Every structure is written in structure tokens, then in C-alpha cells.
């Protein structure tokens, strides 16, 4: 069977016309299936990102190549449970989540998360545990489907899932960051991102701030699953929306500033106003030199009190040259 039907192509064109952020590609069997969609997007110079839905054995077998070809992965457990032995689903879910973390790609766990809430106002204990276990595996996102599309209690389902996730994440934060090995790309940005995450545990950093033109630095930070928030200052709404899918990232669209110092101070004031950091807390700033057009190339750690000191000098002097 072809990866795309004529109806699929019509729907992709509609997504392009409406400037949709993501396309969820169903029943992906191989990287070639992903490429078939990507070729259409590229032909129209579209920046839409592909989320590949893993729903069959062939997709599971080719998961590494599919992850590489996709922006992110959705573990669609409903159809997957029909295509493969149902007792294998928990192990497949765990393995795919870890593969996505290692490859720094967003991963979504979906289908039958709170299935009983389609008809009932409260979930089963098993459903609560299922959601918590997905959080304990460090998934980037959870997705409801029938519960909100046709269920009797859509708002209650969202509120219930949010409460479970928030509670489970507190346990994750006690465990610290994941010691994910650096990739073989010898990326300076990746090295600095891991250093910033390690600082949350070894130096006591309470918040990481980064400016992100493409979202890449924020995604690097997300892959290490740190215990404290990452504030990503985005230059446009598109990147802000994409980063909503990344673990622990709080994307904020700020108007472009002329230098890193103004970006940094705007972010610090925002985080303090929201109550994420106190005057005595340490914060890390991970960024690149805006005027030089370079990538992420410096990491600075200070207390908030030091930053607000009138004598504080921002160390990124290269942006002024």
C-alpha cells in the first residue's frame, strides 16, 4: 500500500495553506513513509513538522530510522495494541521513549489514557497509574483523544491528567537529570546544554534561560530532563509553539532585542514575576552572540541578586564589537 493516499495529499496541502505546526502521520512503517510527506512539504517550502505515529509492528521494527526522519514520535497505543501482542505495549512504549530522549526528539504517549472518562467523571486507578508511569519514563507529552473529542467530561479529563502529571513530575524532579551521553556530533551547543543541566544538581542552579532562534538549544536542554524549568526566549510565534512539545521548556515569544544583555534581563524579570526564582537563587544563561550570527557558545551562572546589582556587568562583550 502507498504511504500516502490522494486524500492524504489533499489534507497535507490544506495543512500547508493554513500554516499548521504539526502533521501527525498515521501508520508509519519506515523512514520512506516520512520522506513521502517531507518531500511534499519541502516542495512548498513549508516548515510544518512531522510527528510519526507508531501503530504497527513494522513501525516498531524500523523505529530508529523513523525517529531520525521525524521531528517527533507519537506512541499511538490503540491501533498498536491491535497490531502487536498487547502484553508487549508497555515495553515498546518504554523503549521508544528512551530512544527519542537519546536522539533528542519529542515523544508523545497517546490513546486510552483516560478512556473510562469518555462516559464517567472519574478515571480508574489503573489509568492514573498508566499516566504516572509515562511521566516516570520522561515522555515529553501526553495526549487525550476520545476523552476530549467525543467524551462527556472533556474538561474534567484534561484537569485530571494535568493533576496526575504535575504530581508525578515532582517525583521525577527528586531524581535529578538523566545522564544522557553526548552524541557523536561533537556539538558545542550540546556540550554546553548538558553542562547547564548538570549545574542544576552540582551547583544548585534553579532556572536555565536560553534564547533560541531555531529551538535547537532548548531541545538539547530538554533531552537531559532537568529538574528545573528552561525558559526559551523565542524570536517568533512558530518556534514558541513548536517548543511547547519539549520537556520542561517554557517558551516565550519576546520581541527581538539588539543584544544578549537585553534578552537576558527581560527573561530574568519575567521568571521572577512568575515566581520561578528568588533573589538568592542561581540562574544559568545559555546563548550565542546575536550580532555575530553564531550558534550557542557561552554559559554564564550567577545569582539573581548579582544580576540585579547596579555594578553587574554582562560578560557577553563580543555582542558590542
Task: Please provide the spans of the model-predicted regions.
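Non-catalytic helical/linker scaffolds that mediate oligomerization, partner binding
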Residues: 1-321
Amino acid at each position: 500500500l502507498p504511504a500516502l493516499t490522494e486524500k492524504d495529499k489533499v489534507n497535507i496541502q490544506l495543512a500547508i495553506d493554513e500554516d499548521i505546526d504539526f502533521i501527525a502521520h498515521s501508520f508509519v512503517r519506515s523512514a520512506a513513509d516520512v520522506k513521502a510527506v517531507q518531500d511534499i512539504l519541502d516542495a512548498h517550502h513549508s516548515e510544518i513538522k512531522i510527528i510519526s505515529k507508531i501503530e504497527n509492528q513494522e513501525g516498531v521494527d524500523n523505529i530508529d530510522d523513523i525517529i531520525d526522519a521525524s521531528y517527533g514520535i507519537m506512541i499511538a497505543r490503540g491501533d498498536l495494541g491491535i497490531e502487536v501482542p498487547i502484553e508487549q505495549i508497555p515495553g515498546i512504549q518504554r523503549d521508544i521513549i528512551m530512544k527519542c530522549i537519546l536522539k533528542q526528539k519529542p515523544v508523545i504517549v497517546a490513546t486510552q489514557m483516560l478512556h473510562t472518562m469518555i462516559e464517567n467523571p472519574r478515571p480508574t486507578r489503573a489509568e492514573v497509574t498508566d499516566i504516572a508511569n509515562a511521566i516516570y519514563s520522561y515522555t515529553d507529552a501526553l495526549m487525550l483523544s476520545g476523552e476530549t473529542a467525543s467524551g462527556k467530561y472533556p474538561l474534567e479529563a484534561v484537569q485530571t491528567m494535568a493533576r496526575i502529571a504535575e504530581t508525578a513530575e515532582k517525583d521525577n524532579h527528586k531524581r535529578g537529570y538523566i545522564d544522557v551521553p553526548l552524541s557523536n556530533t561533537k556539538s558545542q551547543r550540546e556540550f554546553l546544554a548538558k553542562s547547564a543541566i548538570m549545574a542544576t544538581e552540582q551547583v544548585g542552579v534553579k532556572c536555565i534561560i536560553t534564547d533560541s532562534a531555531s529551538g535547537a538549544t532548548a531541545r538539547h536542554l530538554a533531552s537531559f530532563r532537568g529538574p528545573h524549568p528552561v525558559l526559551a526566549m523565542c524570536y517568533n510565534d512558530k518556534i514558541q509553539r513548536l517548543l511547547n512539545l519539549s520537556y520542561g521548556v517554557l517558551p516565550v515569544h519576546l520581541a527581538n532585542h539588539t543584544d544578549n544583555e537585553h534578552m537576558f534581563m527581560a527573561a530574568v524579570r519575567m521568571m521572577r514575576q512568575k515566581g520561578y526564582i528568588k533573589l538568592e537563587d542561581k540562574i544559568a544563561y545559555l546563548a550565542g552572540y546575536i550580532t555575530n550570527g553564531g550558534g550557542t557558545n557561552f554559559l554564564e551562572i550567577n545569582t539573581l541578586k548579582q544580576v540585579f546589582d547596579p555594578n553587574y556587568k554582562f560578560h557577553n562583550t563580543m555582542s558590542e564589537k
